[in-house]
Amino acid sequence: MTTISTDQVAAIARLARLAPDEAQLATFARQFGDILGYMEMLNGLDTTGVEPLYSPVQHATALRSDETAPRCTREDVLRNAPEADSEFFIVPRIV
């Protein structure tokens, strides 16, 4: 079974701008390990002769009519940003 350390989970959380506590890091590490173990099990399956699917169901997706809905204001959206000025998100420089 694949294991993932709490340090690896903390690094992933930092990238996602999350701040889990130590108990949550341990829980997430166990859950990530379970997920990766399941993926390893799926990788071990013999899929010879199985036709690839783009969807598990055979019917087409039903379309719905477009409807207008209330929108968030710029202030509402920027209020949830870790850092913003009056009009834009402020993000770390990448290059």
From Swiss-Prot:
Keywords: ATP-binding, Ligase, Nucleotide-binding, Protein biosynthesis. The keyword ATP-binding applies. InterPro entries: Asp/Glu-ADT_sf_sub_c, GatC. It catalyses: L-glutamyl-tRNA(Gln) + L-glutamine + ATP + H2O = L-glutaminyl-tRNA(Gln) + L-glutamate + ADP + phosphate + H(+); L-aspartyl-tRNA(Asn) + L-glutamine + ATP + H2O = L-asparaginyl-tRNA(Asn) + L-glutamate + ADP + phosphate + 2 H(+). One of its GO terms (molecular function) is asparaginyl-tRNA synthase (glutamine-hydrolyzing) activity. Transmembrane segments: none annotated. Its EC number is 6.3.5.-. The keyword Plastid does not apply. It is an enzyme of class 6 (ligase). GO terms for biological process: glutaminyl-tRNAGln biosynthesis via transamidation; regulation of translational fidelity; translation. Heterotrimer of A, B and C subunits. Allows the formation of correctly charged Asn-tRNA(Asn) or Gln-tRNA(Gln) through the transamidation of misacylated Asp-tRNA(Asn) or Glu-tRNA(Gln) in organisms which lack either or both of asparaginyl-tRNA or glutaminyl-tRNA synthetases. The reaction takes place in the presence of glutamine and ATP through an activated phospho-Asp-tRNA(Asn) or phospho-Glu-tRNA(Gln). Belongs to the GatC family. HAMAP family: GatC (MF_00122). This is Aspartyl/glutamyl-tRNA(Asn/Gln) amidotransferase subunit C.
